[in-house]
C-alpha cells in the first residue's frame, strides 16, 4: 500500500515501512490532488481539507485523521465514493481537560477571585465529562448543556445554553463543529448568548472548534474575558480577537505527548482492522515532557501574541506537555 502521511504526526516513521508499505511524509501544504493521486491511504491532521478538490480521480480508499474531530473531512463525499474515514475520538481528552483547568485557575488568580466559580459546560462528551468531574471535585457548582445527549439518554438535569449564560461565571465549550442539522453548533455562541452572559468577572473558553464561537460577536462584548485556543479561519486568525483575548493560544490544548501517542495508536490499529497489516498490537511509545504542574499557559499566550502570523509554525513546533 501507498500511504501519504502528514509529517507532523508523531511516532509513525518506520512503522508501516516495516510491514513493506511505501510511506510519503509531507508537510500539510504539500498534501494536494497531485501528491495523493496514487495513494491508498491518507494519514492527516486538521490542516488537510479532504473534499472533492483533493480526492477526485485519486486512488484513496481510506482517510485516517489523528484528531478527535473530522469537520475538515467531507464525510458525505467519502461515503458516496467508498472512502473509509477514521478518527481518534477522545485521544487527547485528558490534555484538553488539563488545559481548561490551568486556564480557569490562571484566570481566577489574575482576576483575584477567591471563590469557586459556577462552571457551565457546553458539550459533555469525552472532554466535557472530565472538566465537569474536575470542578465538581473542587466543590464548584457545574451546569451541563448537551442537547443530543439530553435527548438520547433522557437526562433531566441538563440545562439549555441560555440557562448557562444566565447562571454561570465560566462557560467552556467542548462541542464538535456542525452545520445545517438539529442542534448545529456553528456560532452557537453569538450575540444572543453573549448579551445574556455579559458582566464583570465572566469567562468564556473555546477549546472546541473554531466557529463554535462567533468571534465578531465576541469582539463587540468587551466585558467578557475570553480564553481562545480554537479560532475561526485558522491559521489566519483574527488579530483583533487575539488582542481582545484574556489568553490566546495556537490550538494546542490537546497537545500532550500521551494524547498524540493515543491518536497515532488509535488510527494505526483502525487501519490495521481494515487492511490486516500485522499491527494489531502496536502502540506508539512516548516519553514524558513537561507535566501539567509545570505548564505556564501564559508562555503560550506570549508566543502567539509575539508572532500571530506564525500560528501553524507554533503548532507544528510545539513541545508537548505531559
Language-model-detected regions and their locations in the chain:
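Rossmann-like adenosine-cofactor binding region
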Residues: 50-51, 150-239
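Phosphate/diphosphate ligand-binding glycine-rich loop within oxidoreductases
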Residues: 6, 40-111
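Oxidoreductase and adenylate-handling cofactor-binding alpha/beta cores
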Residues: 97-112, 137-140, 265-274
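N-terminal glycine-/charge-rich "phosphate-binding" loop or analogous flexible N-terminal tail
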Residues: 1-39
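Glycine-rich adenosine-cofactor-binding loop
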Residues: 6-7, 89, 97, 115-136
Amino acid at each position: 500500500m501507498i500511504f501519504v502521511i502528514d509529517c507532523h504526526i508523531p511516532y509513525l516513521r518506520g512503522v508501516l515501512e516495516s510491514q513493506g508499505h511505501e510511506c510519503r511524509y509531507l508537510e500539510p501544504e504539500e498534501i494536494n490532488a497531485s501528491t495523493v493521486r496514487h495513494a491508498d491511504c491518507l494519514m492527516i491532521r486538521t490542516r488537510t481539507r479532504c473534499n472533492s478538490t483533493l480526492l477526485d480521480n485519486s486512488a484513496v480508499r481510506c482517510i485516517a485523521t489523528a484528531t478527535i474531530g473530522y469537520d475538515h473531512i467531507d464525510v458525505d463525499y467519502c461515503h458516496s465514493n467508498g472512502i473509509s474515514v477514521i478518527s481518534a475520538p477522545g485521544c487527547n481528552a485528558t490534555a484538553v481537560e488539563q488545559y481548561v483547568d490551568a486556564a480557569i485557575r490562571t484566570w481566577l488568580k489574575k482576576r483575584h477571585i477567591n471563590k469557586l466559580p459556577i462552571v457551565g459546560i457546553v458539550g459533555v462528551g469525552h472532554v466535557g465529562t472530565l472538566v465537569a468531574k474536575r470542578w465538581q471535585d473542587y466543590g464548584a457548582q457545574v451546569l451541563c448543556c448537551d442537547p443530543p445527549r439530553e435527548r438520547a439518554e433522557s437526562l433531566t438535569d441538563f440545562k439549555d445554553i441560555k440557562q448557562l449564560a444566565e447562571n454561570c461565571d465560566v462557560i467552556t465549550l467542548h462541542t464538535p463543529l456542525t452545520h445545517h442539522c438539529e442542534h448545529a453548533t456553528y456560532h452557537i455562541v453569538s450575540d444572543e448568548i453573549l448579551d445574556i452572559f455579559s458582566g464583570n468577572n465572566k469567562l468564556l473558553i473555546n477549546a472546541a472548534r473554531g466557529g463554535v464561537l462567533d468571534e465578531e460577536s465576541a469582539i463587540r462584548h468587551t466585558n467578557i474575558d475570553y480564553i481562545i485556543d480554537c479560532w475561526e479561519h485558522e491559521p489566519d486568525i483574527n488579530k483583533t480577537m487575539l488582542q481582545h483575548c484574556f489568553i490566546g493560544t495556537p490550538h494546542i490544548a490537546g497537545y500532550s505527548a500521551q494524547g498524540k501517542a493515543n491518536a497515532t495508536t488509535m488510527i494505526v490499529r483502525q487501519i490495521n482492522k481494515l487492511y490486516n497489516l500485522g499491527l494489531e498490537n502496536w502502540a506508539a511509545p512516548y516519553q514524558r515532557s513537561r507535566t501539567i504542574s509545570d505548564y505556564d499557559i501564559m508562555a503560550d499566550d506570549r508566543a502567539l501574541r509575539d508572532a500571530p502570523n506564525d500560528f501553524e509554525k507554533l503548532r507544528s513546533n510545539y513541545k508537548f506537555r505531559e
